[in-house]
From Swiss-Prot:
This is Golgin subfamily A member 6-like protein 1. It comes from Homo sapiens. Residues 177-663 form a coiled coil. The keyword Magnesium does not apply. InterPro entries: GOLGA6L. Residues 51-72, 106-120 have a biased composition (Basic and acidic residues).
Length: 668
């Protein structure tokens, strides 16, 4: 069977190739293939360069068979020697019938055999024509399917480009999300630190509040006791004043009734009583003034402490509100991130499904192309067979015509025209030889041209194939690199997301552990506070017993203790204020960082600054008040000195009174 040279058809530039499926080197994939079912096949197809000798030999054999049909003497089995003997016999004038009769079959048998052979060939030709028509129909159907599949491939290429653009957008979005995640993580870390500092401040403030409440209760109790004492002192004072008035009345009555000596003795006694009473009154007045001053100072301190407590409570509430707002913002950001991650997962799933559909469609296209290639090969083989059968049919027709001519010539001329026929046959042989020579020359020229064309085509096709192979290799390498980069990026993103989620979980667990620790610490603090309260109640009971036993000493010691406590509290307040200042400086730094991120926090920072200025003003006021207290203490010292001077004067007056009484007694 002849094998026609199959040209290396170029592949379509827009047809996607699967990297794992083998492509056929001779597979026609150009979309503009002929699809008409009645296209005529060209009869003069180029012959293969290796089959030129066989075609020449077949032509020579056909010419010899024609000669044997006319003249049975020209048998191909005899060879060149039989032709030489024929020429000799003709020249010698021998009978031609002797040469034609020996070693040949009858013409009727040859005609029957030729008719049978022709009928068999016709049947084969009809069957082959039927198969060719079926194959042409299948070819048209496959070409239509190829056209539609290529159209679908173009659509899928457009969809793939859209998906690639979406992928790039999703990568950009993923990068933005990573940046947002990093920003959120930093914000969360800052918020956690800020929350820890605020919790520490809250704990310190709660302890201060607890201590201040305890001191307030103690001061209230002391104030109540002092008020009771003041009431008692006032009642005693009123009683003493009544006693003084009664004594004065008694003196006046005694002056009127009793004699002078008794009057002097009673006057002396009453004077002593008056002096003692006046001294007691002065001492009580001084004590009352001191107690009033102390009460006023304690009330002022109570008011200040209450104001500070209210301010601290307001600050704590504001900080808790800030923390809640930050937690709400973080939750909203986490929800947004989760939604965006869900959208990303959905998009990736859609992309995977679409890629799977693309792969399936490409595999179907490859299978269709392979089917087309196989059917085209079958069609080419059938066309080759058709060409061979057409040649055989032409030869048989020529033979039949020649047989008819020969039979007519045999009937008409038989022996007389044998010599002419032989001469004609010789002339025909010479012409055939000349024609064969011409055919040989033409075939050689055609073969040379075909060889040149085929070499050029082969070179062009080889160059095209090399370029296409290079392009395909580059495309495959590029695709594999892109896929590897995409997979690496996706893996990195997934690893980052998982790491961030693990970090978030770890942070949440740490926060929970810290909260549990805080709860435990608060419970411990509460237990300690309860113990302290119990101990304080016991101490109070003991102090009350001691106060009942030693009222005066206890009062003085309490005053000293109160003063020392006040000093300690003031020192603690100063230390706390210094701590608060340091914390405020830290808070300012944090607020400056947050101010760059959020405008709302700027407003809150301004409020905090205003509050801090108020605190500074309050601290300045406290300093001024302390200075005033020092001035008041100096005034008290001065008053005490004046009191000492007054006492000295009273003593001098008493001495003068005694001298005057002595003079009176001496005069009497």
């Amino acid at each position: 069977m002849l094998m026609w040279p199959q040209p290396h058809l170029p592949t379509h530039p827009h047809l996607p190739t699967h990297p794992h499926l083998p492509t056929h080197p001779h597979l026609p994939t150009h979309p503009h293939l002929p699809t008409h079912p009645h296209l005529p096949t060209h009869p003069h197809l180029p012959t293969h360069p290796m089959m030129s000798k066989e075609t020449r030999q077949s032509k020579l054999a056909e010419a010899k068979e024609q000669l044997t049909d006319h003249h049975p003497q020209t048998n191909p089995s005899v060879g060149t020697a039989a032709s030489d003997t024929k020429k000799k016999k003709i020249n010698n004038g021998t009978n031609p019938e002797t040469t034609t009769s020996g070693g040949c079959h009858s013409p009727e048998d040859e005609q029957k055999a030729s008719h049978q052979h022709q009928e068999a060939l016709r049947r084969e030709l009809e069957a082959q024509v039927h198969t060719i028509r079926i194959l042409t129909c299948q070819k048209t159907e496959l070409q239509m399917a190829l056209y539609y599949s290529q159209h679908a491939v173009k659509q899928l290429e457009g969809e793939a480009r859209d998906l690639i653009s979406r992928l790039h957008d999703s990568w950009k979005f993923a990068g933005e999300l990573e940046q947002a995640l990093s920003a959120v993580a930093t914000q969360k870390k800052k918020a956690d630190r800020y929350i820890e500092e605020l919790t520490k401040e809250r704990d310190a403030l709660s302890l201060e509040l607890y201590r201040n409440t305890i001191t307030d209760e103690e001061l209230k109790e002391k104030n109540a006791k002092l008020q009771e004492k003041l009431q008692l002192v006032e009642s005693e004072k009123s009683e003493i004043q009544l006693n003084v008035k009664e004594l004065k009345r008694k003196l006046e009555r005694a002056k009127l009734l009793l004699p002078q000596q008794q009057l002097q003795a009673e006057a002396d006694h009453l004077g002593k009583e008056l002096q003692s009473v006046s001294a007691k009154l002065q001492a009580q007045v001084e004590e009352n003034e001191l107690w009033n001053r102390l009460n006023q100072q304690q009330e002022e301190k109570m008011w200040r402490q209450e104001e500070k407590i209210q301010e601290w409570e307001e600050k704590i509430q504001e900080q808790e509100e800030k923390i809640r707002e930050q937690e709400e913002k973080i939750r909203e950001q986490e929800e947004k991130m989760r939604r965006q991650e869900e959208m990303m997962w959905e998009k990736e799933e859609k992309m995977r499904r679409q890629e799977e559909m693309m792969w399936e469609k490409e595999e179907k296209m490859r299978r269709l192309e392979e089917m087309m290639w196989e059917k085209e090969e079958k069609i080419r083989e059938l066309e080759e067979k058709m060409h061979e059968q057409e040649k055989i049919r032409e030869q048989e027709e020529k033979r039949q015509e020649e047989e008819k001519i020969r039979e007519q010539e045999k009937r008409q001329e038989q022996e007389a025209k044998m010599w002419r026929q032989e001469e004609k046959i010789r002339e025909q042989e010479e012409k055939i030889r000349e024609q064969e020579k011409k055919m040989w020359r033409q075939e050689e020229k055609i073969h040379e041209q075909e060889k040149i064309r085929e070499e050029e085509k082969r070179q062009e096709q080889e160059e095209m194939w090399r370029q296409e192979e290079k392009i395909r290799e580059q495309e495959e390498i590029w695709r594999q690199k892109e896929k590897m980069h995409e997979q690496e990026k996706i893996r990195k993103q997934e690893e980052k997301v998982w790491r961030q989620e693990e970090k978030m979980h770890d942070q949440e667990e740490k926060i929970r552990e810290q909260e549990e620790k805080m709860w435990r610490q608060e419970e411990k603090i509460r237990e300690q506070e309860e113990k302290i309260r119990e101990q304080e109640e016991k101490i109070r009971e003991q102090e009350e017993m001691m106060q009942e036993q030693e009222e005066k000493m206890g009062e003085q010691e309490e005053k000293m203790q109160e003063q020392e406590k006040m000093r300690r509290q003031e020192e603690k307040i100063r230390e706390q204020e210094e701590k608060i200042r340091e914390q405020k400086e830290k808070i300012r730094e944090q607020e400056e960082k947050i101010w760059e991120q959020e405008e709302k926090i700027r407003e809150q920072e301004e409020m905090m600054q205003e509050q801090e200025e108020k605190m500074w003003e309050q601290e300045e006021k406290m300093c001024e008040q302390e200075e005033k207290m020092q001035e008041q203490e100096e005034k008290m010292r001065r008053q005490e000195e004046k009191m000492w001077e007054q006492e000295v004067r009273l003593r001098q007056q008493e001495e003068k009174m005694q001298e005057h009484q002595e003079h009176l007694e001496a005069a009497i």
